[in-house]
Amino acid sequence: MSSYASQLHEEQQAVDRAYGRLDDLRAEMWQRLSTVRAAGSHGSPTQRTERDSFATMYEDRLTQLRSVEDRLVFGRLDSQDGTRHYIGRIGLSSTNHEPILTDWRAEAARPFYEATPSNHGDIVMRRHITLSFREVVGVEDEVLDVHSDQVGQASTAGTLTGEGALLASLSSR
């Protein structure tokens, strides 16, 4: 398997994990909604109002979970300490509350849009992930810290693009 193909495979595993969690959440919301609807329209006015409120909440959540199907994951940030944060259209956590995907609007995703080679903070690399439905079809890396080990790795894998590629080329001379 080529370096680029192995990068695609690695990202596919992360994307599969995110979509797996999305599918689980959809099933969970559908089950909760079905349970609320099965309760019928009997009970006190307070109970009916509460049931209707829960039904609306579950319907809204299902709508949200359906709306993010296309291009759920589109980026990754790599930090100096080796941690990776995937960026996407919605925030997702595992059942143990470990982050799987960071919502693009969250403060934690801000470096994905704002980091530059001259002002990157602790971000070493930004990766753009291209999906076709649920399949990873492309990755492009922008190395923001040209002194990091990831410059060579991204260059070897053929994923290096943007200003990072230019700066890496200039700093290697």
What are these regions (language model features)?
Residues 1-172:
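Extended, charged low-complexity regulatory segments
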